[in-house]
Swiss-Prot record:
The keyword Protease does not apply. The record marks R231, N232, R241, N242, K247, A248 as: Cleavage. A motif (KID motif) lies at residues 644-646. Residues 65-224 are annotated as: Spike head. Disulfide bonds join C203-C216, C318-C380. This is Outer capsid protein VP4. Residues 389-409 are annotated as: Hydrophobic. One of its GO terms (cellular component) is host cell endoplasmic reticulum-Golgi intermediate compartment. Residues 248-479 are annotated as: Spike body and stalk (antigen domain).
Length: 776
């Protein structure tokens, strides 16, 4: 049988351990060498965290904490917090739209009893009653009126230890803080023409973008950090915010140190990162109402942009990590929408963007230190995707958004179709944004994140502006390349090849002839006949087999055999300790792992489903251990694999180990197994469905899970190539005799071939479904 290939791989995979050990010893021996550190090593100094040194500022980066600035009167931009840092009690800030809102904030020192004080607000002397009963905290209070000649009312007090306050114009409102630190929260006042509100500050202040509101709240509650990473050291006039320094350019190459052979160069670059997401949408076979997968894929993008009057050619690769798997099941009918898995990126996910351009900075990016980067944030919003059903209104997925925030940078290598590029990998953390996403015309709504269905929303690319700085050790002669291989490989060319090969394999399912497949499944395929279709020399055949076995021994199938071996040892020892007691648990647990679950067989259907599903996961190994004359799922799996290997034009010795291992794990995921007891058949599938029925009438009988567990231990396990539903359908439409039914139950290959040659639509459809399940 074709499944012999899997048995050979399981049997022989241990033999590669010796060659691995010899290789490891040799590698350790040859790599134990002494290296002369040279003049650029820092081995004589204590451990230290290297920083970027002087990184020239540019207008592309929006600082988190911009300031401090001197007191002034101006119209703050919408969507920016003004963080006020007063040093004395009195009026802190005032603002008005000259229509229906006059608002000011007053600071009151601790331990002030109720009293009237005179404040100058909008140039007018005002008598206001104030108090602060706190012994330690300062009190900010908002005073507001809605007419120019009206009286002031007090709102939203803030008791503050750090003595900081903030105000922002956004969304038709004026936002402030209230409560008590360290638990202060934001509030707001409605105002018409809010964007025209002019504000006058009477203390030093900072400017913080709304995207960093969490940072602003942290400052309000806990105070500014002791060492502030701000633009200015002392307060400057606000007009200095728009003055561009011409002392140094943002894009320059600086010689840090130099000897006769080597030099250290600092590269400062402004960059524009453009990227896009790619996705894979796979429909299941059948009537057209089922989708098996909607997932993210790495995406390459090449573009040009201008930097200091010079055209730059850049290349990016965007990939995601930490995806969240969602699913949707509209019902049990064949015409109900089903999405087995669709990926969503959320706040626990990361986006990686590998960036390369044709500037001098990337030419010798091998020995690098002091790598630092600053990048702006960007919001990625999803679009529509229609689930095109054959009949009825189409559901569609819409919405979803995340914002990307810079979280680090490291070296990487990008692999294109022609060349590998030393590049920078920018890591972005995610935050969910409005709007939420939903599957319209279903009950799925109000979910947050960015689904993989349409992550680009019709855009050609997303864009992020930023800059980076690094110091690179390069040859003093600019005509020389750094004599070493690629720096840090984080995305292998093999992954790209495997992705293309998986797509080709899945497409080849339509080209397999069923009659030939049955004949091929009956052949005793071994490793050499399986791999003979690959275009390689005979000398490489042994190496290919060794590499396949090396990969196969780490597969889930090999791990299951190892776990089963331990279980059998435990079962044998328990029997020897208590040989007089033969319980279901002691005899079955090695194969079924349900010794603790069969305490209440008739409790509920869900309990039986759980138990049969647990048993079914190990029936594949049981079937391998007790080979019968019938055909099994692994025979079909191996035959499909062999056919696709022979037809493939992209298969290579490098990709074969991964493909064979994946095929053993992923081909035909939905399997059903049966045991026969006289005229009764017990059938259970890996997804928890179970049937018990009589052979002569196909009439269902109660399913006895304990009897099924006993039969699994003592009787041969048979792959349900033609499952119960197909058998019942065949009997209802065509009628089959008892002997013919037994042959189909035993998966007799001769009978299966006869039905296929007779072009029986029910049997052909079942075999087609199994072939379509052979996907990677």
């Amino acid at each position: 049988m074709a499944s012999l290939i899997y048995r050979q791989l399981l049997t022989n995979s241990y033999t590669v351990n010796l060659s691995d050990e010899i290789q490891e010893i040799g590698s350790t021996k040859t790599q134990n060498i002494t290296i002369n550190p040279g003049p650029f090593a820092q081995t004589g100094y204590a451990p230290v965290n290297w920083g970027p040194g002087e990184t020239n500022d540019s207008t592309t980066i929006e600082p988190v904490l911009d300031g401090p600035y001197q007191p002034t009167s101006f119209n703050p931009p919408v969507g920016y917090w003004m963080l006020l840092s007063p040093t004395a009690p009195g009026v802190v800030v005032e603002g008005t739209n000259n229509t229906d809102r006059w608002l000011a904030t007053i600071l009151i020192e601790p331990n002030v009893t109720s009293q009237q004080r005179t404040y100058t607000i909008f140039g007018v002397q005002e008598q206001i009653t104030v108090e602060n009963t706190s012994q330690t905290q300062w009190r900010f209070v908002d005073v507001s009126k809605t007419t120019q000649n009206g009286s002031y009312s007090q709102y939203s007090p803030l008791l503050s230890t750090p003595k900081l306050y903030a105000v922002m114009k956004y969304g038709g409102r004026i936002h402030t803080y209230s409560g008590q630190t360290p638990n202060a929260t934001t509030g707001y006042y409605s105002a018409t023409n809010y964007d025209s509100v002019n504000m006058t500050t009477f203390c030093d202040f900072y400017i913080i973008p709304r995207s960093e509101e969490s940072k602003c709240t942290e400052y309000i509650n806990n105070g500014l950090p002791p060492i502030q990473n701000t633009r200015n050291i002392i307060p400057l006039a606000l007009s200095a915010r728009n003055v561009r320094s011409l002392k140094a350019q943002s894009n320059e190459d600086i010689v840090v140190s130099k000897t006769s052979l080597w030099k250290e160069m600092q590269y400062n670059r402004d960059i524009t990162i453009r990227f896009k997401f790619a996705n894979s949408i796979v429909k299941s076979g059948g009537l057209g109402y089922k989708w098996s997968e909607i997932s993210f894929k790495p995406a390459n993008y090449q573009y040009t942009y201008m930097r200091d009057g010079e055209e730059v050619t850049a290349h990016t690769t965007c990939s995601v990590n930490g995806m969240n798997d969602f699913s949707f099941n509209g019902g049990s009918l064949p015409t109900d929408l089903l999405i087995s898995r669709y990926e969503v990126i959320k706040e626990n996910s990361y986006v990686y963007i590998d960036y390369w351009d044709d500037s001098q900075a990337f030419r010798n990016m091998v020995y690098v230190r002091s790598l630092a980067a600053n990048l702006n944030s960007v919001i990625c919003a999803g679009g529509h995707y229609n689930f095109a059903l054959p009949v009825g209104q189409w559901p569609y997925m819409t919405g979803g958004a995340v914002s990307l925030h810079s979280a680090g940078v490291t070296l990487s290598t990008q692999f294109t179709d022609f060349v590998s590029l030393n590049s920078l990998r920018f890591r972005f953390r995610l935050a969910v944004e409005e709007p939420s996403f939903a599957i319209m015309r279903t009950r799925v709504s109000g979910l947050y994140g960015l689904p993989a269905a349409n992550p680009n929303n019709g855009r050609e690319y997303y864009e992020i502006a930023g800059r980076f700085s690094l110091i690179s050790l390069i040859p003093s002669n600019d005509n020389y390349q750094t004599p070493i291989a690629n720096s840090v490989t984080v995305r292998q060319d093999l992954e790209r090849q495997l992705g293309e090969l998986r797509e080709e394999f899945n497409a080849l399912s339509q080209e397999i002839a069923m009659s030939q497949l049955i004949d091929l499944a009956l052949l005793p395929l071994d490793m050499f006949s399986m791999f003979s279709g690959i275009k390689s020399t005979i000398d490489a055949a042994k190496s290919i087999a060794t590499n396949v076995m090396k990969k196969f021994k780490k597969s889930s199938l090999a791990s299951s055999v190892s776990t089963l071996t331990d279980s059998l040892s435990d079962a044998a020892s328990s029997l020897s300790r208590g040989s007089s007691i033969r319980s279901v648990g002691s005899s079955v647990s090695a194969w079924t792992d349900v010794s603790t679950q069969i305490t209440d067989v008739s409790s509920s259907v869900s309990s039986i489903s759980t138990q049969t599903s647990t048993i079914s996961r190990r029936l594949r190994l049981k079937e391998m251990a007790t080979q019968t004359e019938g055909m099994n799922f692994d025979d079909i799996s191996a035959a499909v694999l062999k056919t696709k290997i022979d037809k493939s034009i992209q298969i290579s010795p490098n990709t074969l180990p991964d493909i064979v291992t994946e095929a053993s794990e992923k081909f035909i995921p939905n399997r059903a197994y049966r045991v026969i007891n006289n005229d009764e058949v017990f059938e259970a599938s890996t997804d928890g469905r179970f049937f018990a029925y009589r052979v002569d009438t196909f009439e269902e009988i109660p399913f006895d899970v304990q009897k099924f567990a006993d039969l699994v231990t003592d009787s041969p396990v048979i792959s349900a190539i033609i499952d119960f539903k197909t058998l019942k359908n065949l009997n209802d439409n065509y009628g089959i005799g008892k002997q013919q039914a037994f042959n189909l139950l035993r998966s007799d290959p001769k009978v299966l071939r006869e039905f296929i040659n007779q072009n029986n639509p029910i049997i052909r459809n079942r075999i087609e479904q199994l072939i379509m399940q052979c996907r990677l």
